Amino acid sequence: MLRSVVNNNDKAKESEQSVRVATDDPTYQSYAFQPSTSSSNISWFGGLRTKLSQLSLFPDWMSQLGIKSDDEKMETSSTSSPQSEQSIGEYDESTLVFRPVQLDHFGGAGQEDDGEQVDIWDFGATFLADLDSNHVWNDTIERQHFGPLKDLITTGGGANKINNHSFKTHSLLHPTWCDKCGDFIWGILKEALKCEHCNYTCHARCRDLVTLDCRSPGSSLASSTEFDSIYPQLDGTLGTIPKGLILPPAMSSSTGSDKENGNGNSAGISAENPIFSVKNSFTLPKSFSPVDSLRTKEPSAPPESRYATLRVVERYVKEDTPFEWTDEYKEMDLERKIHSYNSLAKGMEITLHEDGVNFGGHIHVNMNLSRPISVVQGVIPPTVYDVVNTAKSTAKTTSLRTITSFFLPRNTAKVINIDSKTTARKMIVTLLKKFRVADNPRKFALYECEQITDEATCTLNRKLTRISDDACPLKVVLNWQSPHCGRALVLQENDTGDILWDAFEIPELENFLRILGMEEKQYVFQTQQKYQQYRYHLDAELRQRGHSVPDAAAQPMVQTNPFLDEEFLRNQDEYGTSDSMLFSGTIKNAIMGEDPDYVNLEYLKKQNMDQSTNL
């Protein structure tokens, strides 16, 4: 590690902020900076922070930005070693926490964590202790979990653009996130693009940047390329199956791939999903039951009448109140409930802690994701050139990282270890951090899936209940009394409109309200202007045909909504107030002096009015 240190005590105050620190550690490459030599900027920032520190919400906001207060700095300096005062940042590999450079003194950050590495699926108290810090629990709209996501190279799907998606304009009834850039898509007048086959959702501006192949939700593991068989083709009937033979359906495994589940000649499960509207079907016997599937039954009817189509009906239930706050959950006689659960859960036991209140154990989480996820790769090791020329190119060289998008196989099951104090939101955030998933944690939600089979109608009723972010998944599992009761924890996209608006910051909520009010006024103005245009051209047509019109309507002017803040709109680019919101093309065209998209003046002028009334 190369460092240039100023040891002159007389010039220490003058050159304290101009000390140039260089390092060959690849961890710090993404935080390379050009130190400022002006002391006026530092004093200006210190005075501004002193003025703003009088506000009640300022300390929390500063902590989210990574700038510590004076009390936190004293605690950090008291616990740090002399070696830590020389580093410019801190990198904790077990929790992937990035802490920025302090503006007051560049050499006053903490040291690296020398503790033992936590198991990849161990979400015990050692790992969850860091979730209380502001650096980890920074679940904002922007993707900030792995440091600044800059200088990334897209590797998923190759470097060429993919055009096999069937994108359709999709009106957003509920807010969501873009699968390409990860920005927030929100607004009544906003229209996103959604693929009909793989549910890929993105901005209109991100369509040309998509490099991921289209893949239907039911074939996430199926290969898109067909390879020729290496075996020769045999003539005759050698090894063939008679056409009149009816084969029983192959029983599929819950953890197998789609090819193992019988995605061959016979179809899949007929699923009616209100979110994705995906429908497949495969043939199963009428006597099929998930509980009694291993039990052999005698055929009671001819083979042709023993088969029917299994119909799967999914019903989503919103859970507003945390489960442990309801009357159904009781913490009385906790030791007896844990003993009863462990007698049926072999290998998934729950252990009661010494305090007699908290407990921990293993749970199954099925990751049923239909939309792609983006994974950030770690820092690339430095080359020999970077090590030799570190002192010259530290301020110009940035760390090169990659981000890869792919479809996670459906029903991917993971076993994790949590305790009774871990909430659903913390578990989701921690799980995504371990996978280095760059998607916003609010994009996902945890559901409790309950399956009930109706043999009379050959229907599998699946009830998905949203587990509140404040609820503890381990307490929910303990209330099942058995891990084999037909229930499971499912992690999937939060596309049911259950966005927790109370988790946003106050400036973000105020911005949402302002944009929502502007869009409401713009929508009303569009409707009024549309019918004024029709009235004007109808009156003109009646006068042309010789009919007397008592009150001739004046031609309305094509202009923007006078209720909108034009100065505010002029300062917006095509990305809106930030990279996470879009303004409609109507507002943009009106500002630029063009005709709005919702009024087709050329058609009304050139065509007859009897044809224009069919619009």
Curated annotation (Swiss-Prot):
The gene is rsf-1. Interacts with rab-39 (GTP-bound form). Interacts (via SARAH domain) with cst-1; the interaction is required for the phosphorylation of cst-1. One of its GO terms (molecular function) is zinc ion binding. GO terms for biological process: actin filament organization; chromosome condensation; morphogenesis of embryonic epithelium; positive regulation of phosphorylation; positive regulation of response to oxidative stress; regulation of vulval development; signal transduction. It comes from Caenorhabditis elegans. Residues 1-29, 69-89, 249-268 are annotated as: Disordered. One of its GO terms (cellular component) is cytoplasm. The keyword Zinc-finger applies. Gene3D superfamilies: 1.20.5.110, 3.30.60.20, Phosphatidylinositol 3-kinase Catalytic Subunit, Chain A, domain 1 (3.10.20.90). A zinc finger (Phorbol-ester/DAG-type) spans 164-214. This is Ras association domain-containing protein 1 homolog. The lineage of its organism: Eukaryota, Metazoa, Ecdysozoa, Nematoda, Chromadorea. It comes from the Eukaryota. Residues 498-545 form the SARAH domain. PANTHER family: RAS ASSOCIATION DOMAIN-CONTAINING PROTEIN 1 HOMOLOG (PTHR22738:SF10), RASSF (PTHR22738).
